[in-house]
């Protein structure tokens, strides 16, 4: 095998399978492997083109008759939290986020397992073992980090390791942060931790001077994915490129399941 063939990505198309987001529809994906010295550059390029990363695979929908999955990225520097978002921030004022190396722990897996059992027991990840989780975190040839979210008591020092309540697996791109996967302690669902972690990533991107936070696919009408449309202003990937969408352009629903 030549160096050129190793560095040139090969793309593959999956067979049709039931869509996990919209009823009575099927999905197909195009994917490639993120390996080699240029994996980070390729991940950057493909993310800009609407791909998502899962371990060492980059993929995007390639459905025959459906274009419901729309890549979205929040414009971090212009984002201003709404009244409801400010309530979420206040509700989680006792939560401290810490950036760590992409190293899996049993503490993380315990929450991951509880999260899947409570919220996604019928999903494609429902049977993931601790080894599967370790692979999800570690099998990366790009710049990846773990952000842990811990509860801090009123009298606790900020550096004390409090109870872990949420985790985000995040890629660092040339122009932003890409939230690969996030999960939280289901018993803490009243905190709206999913929303809080997105708000924290927007703040982190702004502090790092990065313009965007990539949220993955927004699917209008999908209970699982529709919430991503609430973080404005944002850009959505269309056939002509990334198009800006502001809050005034569409009605917003200020609650996340």
From Swiss-Prot:
Its EC number is 2.3.2.29. GO terms for biological process: ubiquitin-dependent protein catabolic process via the N-end rule pathway. The keyword Cytoplasm applies. It comes from the Bacteria. One of its GO terms (molecular function) is leucyl-tRNA--protein transferase activity. It is found in: Cytoplasm. InterPro entries: Acyl_CoA_acyltransferase, Asp_Glu_LeuTrfase, N-end_Aminoacyl_Trfase, N-end_Aminoacyl_Trfase_C, N-end_Aminoacyl_Trfase_N. Pfam families: ATE_C, ATE_N. GO terms for cellular component: cytoplasm. It catalyses: N-terminal L-glutamyl-[protein] + L-leucyl-tRNA(Leu) = N-terminal L-leucyl-L-glutamyl-[protein] + tRNA(Leu) + H(+); N-terminal L-aspartyl-[protein] + L-leucyl-tRNA(Leu) = N-terminal L-leucyl-L-aspartyl-[protein] + tRNA(Leu) + H(+). It is an enzyme of class 2 (transferase). The keyword Acyltransferase applies. Keywords: Acyltransferase, Cytoplasm, Transferase. Belongs to the R-transferase family. Bpt subfamily. Functions in the N-end rule pathway of protein degradation where it conjugates Leu from its aminoacyl-tRNA to the N-termini of proteins containing an N-terminal aspartate or glutamate. NCBIfam families: PRK01305.1-1 (NF002341), PRK01305.1-3 (NF002342), PRK01305.1-4 (NF002343), PRK01305.2-3 (NF002346). HAMAP family: Bpt. This is Aspartate/glutamate leucyltransferase.
């Amino acid at each position: 095998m030549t160096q050129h063939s190793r560095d040139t990505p090969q793309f593959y198309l999956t067979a049709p399978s039931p869509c996990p987001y919209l009823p009575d529809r099927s999905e197909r994906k195009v994917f490639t492997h993120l390996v080699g010295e240029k994996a980070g550059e390729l991940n950057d390029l493909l993310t800009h083109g609407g791909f998502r990363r899962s371990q060492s695979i980059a993929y995007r929908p390639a459905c025959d008759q459906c274009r419901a999955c729309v890549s979205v990225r929040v414009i971090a520097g212009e984002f201003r939290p709404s009244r409801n978002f400010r309530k979420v921030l206040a509700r989680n004022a006792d939560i401290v986020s810490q950036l760590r190396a992409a190293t899996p722990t049993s503490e993380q897996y315990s929450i991951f397992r509880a999260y899947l059992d409570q919220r996604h027991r019928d999903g494609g990840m429902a049977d993931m073992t601790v080894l599967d989780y370790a692979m999800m975190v570690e099998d990366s040839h790009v710049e990846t980090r773990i952000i842990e979210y811990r509860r801090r008591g009123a009298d606790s020092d900020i550096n004390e390791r409090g109870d872990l309540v949420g985790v985000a697996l995040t890629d660092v791109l040339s122009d932003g942060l890409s939230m690969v996967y996030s999960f939280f302690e289901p018993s803490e669902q009243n905190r709206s931790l999913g929303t809080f972690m997105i708000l924290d990533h927007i703040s982190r991107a702004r502090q790092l001077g990065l313009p965007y936070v990539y949220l993955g696919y927004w699917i209008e009408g999908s209970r699982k994915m529709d919430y991503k449309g609430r973080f404005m202003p944002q850009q959505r990937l269309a056939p002509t490129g990334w198009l800006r969408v502001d809050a005034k352009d569409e009605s917003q629903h200020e609650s996340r399941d």
